[in-house]
Amino acid sequence: MTPSELRRLYSIVRVLLSYGLDELIPKMRLTFPLRAGRRLLFWLPNRHRNMPLGERLRLALQELGPVWIKFGQMMSTRRDLFPPAIADQLAMLQDKVEPFDGKLAREQIELSMGGIPLEEWFDDFDIKPLASASIAQVHTACLKSTGKEIVIKVIRPDILPVIKADMRLMKRLAGWLPRLLPDGRRLRPREVVLEYEKTLLDELNLLREAANAIQLRRNFENSPMLYVPEIYSDYCSEGMLVMERIYGIPVSDVDALKANGTDMKLLAERGVQVFFTQVFRDSFFHADMHPGNIFISYEHPEDPQYIGIDCGIVGSLNKEDKRYLAENFIAFFNRDYRKVAELHVDSGWVPADTNVADFEFAIRTVCEPIFEKPLAEISFGHVLLNLFNTARRFNMEVQPQLVLLQKTLLYIEGVGRQLYPQLDLWKTAKPFLETWMKRQVGLPAVFRALKEKAPFWAEKLPEVPELFYDGLRQHKMLKHSVDQLAYELKTQQARQGQSRYLLGIGATLLISGTLLLISRVEADMVPAGLMAAGIVTWIIGWRRTR
């Protein structure tokens, strides 16, 4: 470790111990050095003894900074690793920090513009930030060319070295974990950290966020359900994002929404429809839809429209994942646990040699109590959570796209029930899922697939005669090769049969001569002749096997 890494490690240890998080170290022989080391650091007492463990963990991560805050947010979705009290606290982590100097933001913007003075492109730049987070902050301005109001998102100037240093430490810690914990290898800590690093570095590239927002805007163009602000891509770079400024009511401000006359039932149901449309129609979903990234338009409160911002994290599902997921939901709510178990095996999410009967029983044991509640009170997100946690006991591979989906579904469900507590999410989603499933089977689906593949076949059709001729020629050559191989195999088998016969005769003659010699028969030449003939015959047989 470098001196700077050692200093940072000491800083992390100091914060963790000040919140008494050493109690998370399991009491076992392998972890004795860690527990002994804790006693040596006697000058770092637990200063928050009266707080619950989950709250202490949340506060410690917030004190450690952006890398650890976002890691805690991600780990809040892994409820197979933490008890509910800790996972709930991790989900409350707030990604809010003090804004950095507006003059520095101005310098960063001009640097992203290639050194061009900010006034050449923008008017009315507000040096005071509109919003600030751990990765970036936002300033308002107007486009000089059109006068349109915009917001400029700019990456913090000092954030990259901090992130890289903390990620190096996190990887080292992940490498130690399997050696210290008996279950450490199954948890795959290194893979979890590498996945997190990729997500974090993606967020640092605002060109990626711009591309995601453009895609999402195109998917919901002219939609009454969701509006995505326009991105001005000519002004965007890795460190700067420029987009249309929007005005709306934060989705968490229920009182303001009601005061505006918003149809709360329709708004809650539309949130569910937006989510399932993104997942099943578009295979491209906004995976960071927490309340801070969702607003509601002031216009047409009787026909409310969502406004989505911050597309830094997105997810996607392939066709097979979508089909299996939809079938899982439908089978689960029909209480067909056998089907749920078979779908997990068929999809490859759990190993092919999984005992389906045992898996079905485990799913039934965990999920059947859920149906003691009315359907309107059943949580889709917790259904997924229970399914995945049960499947992990049967060696289910971690599916990053499903973890993102589960997290997003929990956000959407929480927001929906905050807006309209009587929201029946299953009743809203079931028609959508059943309609989507019907579109995937039958003649319409076949014709649609043919239409999608038409350009491919139009390109390949002229090559069909040549491919057909090549196939016939290769078939003829293959037949000749097979015949030749069969002949050689038959010859080899015949030679091996003769060899075994000669080896048997040689061994018989050799044994007979030896027995005669031992019995001291008077005709001494007979056993010697038999032994000599046996040796010669055995050698001939052995050579024919080569």
UniProtKB/Swiss-Prot annotation:
GO cellular component terms, semicolon-separated: plasma membrane
Membrane spanning stretches: 499-519, 521-541
Domain of life assignment: Bacteria
Membrane topology field: Multi-pass membrane protein
Record bears the keyword Transit peptide: no
Major enzyme class: transferase
Compartment(s) of residence: Cell inner membrane
One Pfam family, short name: ABC1
Keyword Cytoplasm among record annotations: no
GO MF: ATP binding; protein kinase activity
Function according to Swiss-Prot or TrEMBL: Is probably a protein kinase regulator of UbiI activity which is involved in aerobic coenzyme Q (ubiquinone) biosynthesis.
UniProt similarity note: Belongs to the ABC1 family. UbiB subfamily.
Protein name per its UniProtKB record: Probable protein kinase UbiB
Species, as recorded: Pectobacterium carotovorum subsp. carotovorum (strain PC1)
Source organism phylogeny: Bacteria, Pseudomonadati, Pseudomonadota, Gammaproteobacteria, Enterobacterales
